[in-house]
């Protein structure tokens, strides 16, 4: 029997992002928390000052927690505007996670003290917005404004999970941040579901005995 050679997926290198011309105020928007079984989906919108650049911006998932925490005050200080938006577990259950993420992004943009004339959204789809918008695949790696938004959203949500951990230490939220890990599944099995769990997510439904 012939052994098939291992195939490795070639990494697709995306070209550097070219900013559309003719826009003065550009906001970057990103989300954190679509995958977890518990808590809000959190988004952030950031308008950076081109005359006051921030070194070391990158996708929040690729930065250490220490680096994210170091960059956060600098982003808040140097940005022309920043805001956080969110949707609760109840809204996620009512809308579905994709629509809830879009609503949370709308809320982040609406919360900016200065409204942008262009919003760059990480991913492949945009929420309905009152200004021009463009989806940017891997935007958190290619667009500084989106990287900054990614860092804010990640730090905010992680801190909320640490607070939830204080309320429910038996679940280990500070470690797994609500994601569907083995430890989280075991905690649900042992301790049940809390009000902050997303009841529409399959593992939570299963724990509640809700049939599909």
UniProtKB/Swiss-Prot annotation:
Protein name according to UniProt: Ribonuclease HII
Function: Endonuclease that specifically degrades the RNA of RNA-DNA hybrids.
Name of the encoding gene: rnhB
GO biological process: DNA replication, removal of RNA primer; mismatch repair
Keyword Secreted annotated: no
Similarity-based family: Belongs to the RNase HII family.
One GO CC term, this protein: cytoplasm
Location in or out of the cell: Cytoplasm
CC cofactor: Mn(2+); Mg(2+)
Classification via CDD domains: RNase_HII_bacteria_HII_like
Residues that span the membrane, as ranges: none
Record-linked Gene3D superfamilies: Ribonuclease H-like superfamily/Ribonuclease H
């Amino acid at each position: 029997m012939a052994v098939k050679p291992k195939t490795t997926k070639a990494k697709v290198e995306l070209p550097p992002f070219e900013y559309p011309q003719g826009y003065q105020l550009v906001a970057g928007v990103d989300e954190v928390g679509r995958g977890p079984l518990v808590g809000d989906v959190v988004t952030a919108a950031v308008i950076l000052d081109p005359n006051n650049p921030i070194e070391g911006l990158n996708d929040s998932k690729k930065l250490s927690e220490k680096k994210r925490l170091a960059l956060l005050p600098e982003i808040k200080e140097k940005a022309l505007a920043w805001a956080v938006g969110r949707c609760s577990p109840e809204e996620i259950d009512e809308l579905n996670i994709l629509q809830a993420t879009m609503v949370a992004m709308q809320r982040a943009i609406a919360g900016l003290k200065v409204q942008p004339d262009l919003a760059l959204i990480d991913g492949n789809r945009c929420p309905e917005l009152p200004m021009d918008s463009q989806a940017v695949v891997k935007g958190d790696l290619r667009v500084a404004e989106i990287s900054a938004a990614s860092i804010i959203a990640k730090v905010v949500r992680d801190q909320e999970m640490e607070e939830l951990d204080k309320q429910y230490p038996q679940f280990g939220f500070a470690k797994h941040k609500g994601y569907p890990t083995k430890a989280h599944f075991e905690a649900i099995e042992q301790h049940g579901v809390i009000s902050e769990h997303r009841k529409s997510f399959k593992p939570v439904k299963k724990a509640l005995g809700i049939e599909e």
